[in-house]
């Protein structure tokens, strides 16, 4: 970088301000959780692929959610694990940082929309069972999934384009363990008003709007479940819907606290903890929630294991 050129070409990720020993312990713990995330979501994908009884719209959307969780964790966690326990400067170049921000936003937006599609699928299955097979055809499910990915990626691209128009001339220390968009914007040498407005508008469109749709869907689903005469049918419907509601609560709850709730005295540390939920804990917990609370997934696992033993 020459004397007359002050543009930042790389950033320093400050990560967690902890002692080296604690960072090494966290590195081991987070590595273990990351492996569980890959194995759990990989197992969900494998079961859906191998068991024909899971070839339904609900598990089609669940497979997309598993792909998002694997991608989400793989975008943020490896860099964090590399930096944990290092005494030297933890740098990341501008282009990889921008790419990490794009992928982070794309996966987050897409997961919001996929969760809405899953709630719509449950609404049709429980409230309109006679029309379910006609409306939720494979072609329709594919269009809904592709639309979710396209909208999520397009919104993320808008955020990145608005970041690229900003000058970064120092400081160059990101108080985070990855290139989270709010932390990156704090380093800009120009007014970020437009970026903040777009982030707020996107939060309303991609967070508040979908959450309202999910809540409306489940209010009608709950009313329909309570009208079911069969105790077994009621338990099965509650089991499937409660798994999805747990996932919705984890994802939207942490997102609302992070982007829309009043900031604490230590907003940077709050963002780091909440980002851990996004990047590591939520992706790890989603397959556990579905495997422990969903009878169909547990049944599929038993059938797959039985086939392997019979060979």
From Swiss-Prot:
UniProt xrefs under InterPro entries: GPCR_Rhodpsn, GPCR_Rhodpsn_7TM, Olfact_rcpt
A Pfam cross-reference name: 7tm_4
Q: How does it sit in the membrane?
A: Multi-pass membrane protein
Q: List the disulfide bonds.
A: 97-189
UniProt record, GO biological process: detection of chemical stimulus involved in sensory perception of smell
PROSITE patterns under this entry?
G_PROTEIN_RECEP_F1_1 (PS00237), G_PROTEIN_RECEP_F1_2 (PS50262)
Q: Which CDD domains did the record assign? A: 7tmA_OR2A-like
Under the heading Gene3D superfamilies, the entry gives:
Rhodopsin 7-helix transmembrane proteins
Instruction: Tell me the GO molecular function terms.
Output: G protein-coupled receptor activity; olfactory receptor activity
* Glycan-carrying positions: 4
Pull the Cytoplasmic topological domain ranges from the record. 49-56, 121-139, 220-236, 293-311
UniProt subcellular location: Cell membrane
Q: Provide Extracellular-side residue ranges.
A: 1-24, 79-100, 159-196, 260-272
Question: Mind naming one GO cellular-component term on file for this protein?
Answer: plasma membrane
Which UniProt keywords are present, listed alphabetically? Cell membrane, Disulfide bond, G-protein coupled receptor, Glycoprotein, Membrane, Olfaction, Receptor, Sensory transduction, Transducer, Transmembrane, Transmembrane helix
Stretches that traverse the bilayer: 25-48, 57-78, 101-120, 140-158, 197-219, 237-259, 273-292
Protein origin, superkingdom: Eukaryota
Q: What is its main location?
A: membrane
Job description of the protein: Odorant receptor.
| Entry's family note | Belongs to the G-protein coupled receptor 1 family.
Q: In its UniProt entry, what is this protein called? A: Olfactory receptor 2A5
The species this protein belongs to is Homo sapiens (Human)
């Amino acid at each position: 970088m020459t004397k007359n050129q002050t543009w930042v070409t790389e950033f320093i990720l400050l990560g967690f301000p902890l002692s080296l020993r604690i960072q090494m312990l966290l590195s081991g713990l987070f590595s273990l959780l990351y492996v569980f995330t890959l194995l759990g979501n990989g197992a969900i994908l494998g079961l859906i692929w191998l068991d024909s009884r899971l070839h339904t719209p609900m598990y089609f959307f669940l497979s997309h959610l598993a792909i998002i969780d694997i991608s989400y964790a793989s975008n943020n966690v490896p860099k964090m694990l590399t930096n944990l326990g290092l005494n030297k400067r933890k740098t990341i170049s501008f282009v990889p940082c921008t790419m990490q921000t794009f992928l982070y936003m794309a996966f987050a937006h897409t997961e919001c929309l996929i969760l809405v599609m899953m709630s719509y699928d449950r609404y049709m299955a429980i409230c309109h069972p006679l029309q379910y097979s006609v409306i939720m055809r494979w072609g329709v499910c594919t269009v809904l999934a592709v639309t979710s990915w396209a909208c999520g990626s397009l919104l993320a691209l808008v955020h990145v384009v608005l970041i690229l128009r900003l000058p970064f001339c120092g400081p160059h220390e990101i108080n985070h363990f990855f290139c989270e968009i709010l932390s990156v914007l704090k380093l800009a040498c120009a007014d970020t008003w437009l970026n903040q407005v777009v982030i707020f508008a996107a939060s309303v469109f991609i967070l508040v709007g979908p959450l309202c749709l999910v809540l409306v869907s489940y209010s009608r689903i709950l009313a329909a479940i309570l009208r079911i005469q069969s105790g077994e049918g009621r338990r099965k419907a509650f089991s499937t819907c409660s798994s999805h509601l747990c996932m919705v609560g984890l994802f939207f709850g942490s997102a609302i606290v992070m982007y829309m709730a009043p900031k604490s005295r230590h907003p940077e540390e709050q963002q780091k903890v909440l980002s851990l939920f996004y990047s590591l804990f939520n992706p790890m917990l989603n397959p556990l929630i579905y495997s422990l609370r969903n009878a169909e997934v547990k049944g599929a696992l038993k059938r797959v294991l039985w086939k392997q033993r019979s060979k």
